[in-house]
């Protein structure tokens, strides 16, 4: 059963960034400060990277997403308001009519999220 819920959601900045990393952004929903986790996307870690290459690509992914948002004409959230283990709302982020997750994957700054296996950025980046 799908329930439609109306909510006031807006992106917010924290330390001059809209997004913490390439797949987590800051929002305000009905006046509460929360984070969203972009669905179907995995980007390199920046808080606890396993190698320098992972950190570098993670920062590029974050900066790319922040630039997309800063230059957007329209921003939409598509979510069922489900939360992940860390309390982030799982959501699609649509920027100017395009799925942000898809754009990040197309630009080789992330991969499609796989629940069964964590992507090994250091192993993959070693071969580039």
Where are the regions that the model predicts?
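Small beta-barrel nucleic-acid-binding modules, primarily SNase/OB-fold domains
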Residues: 1-128
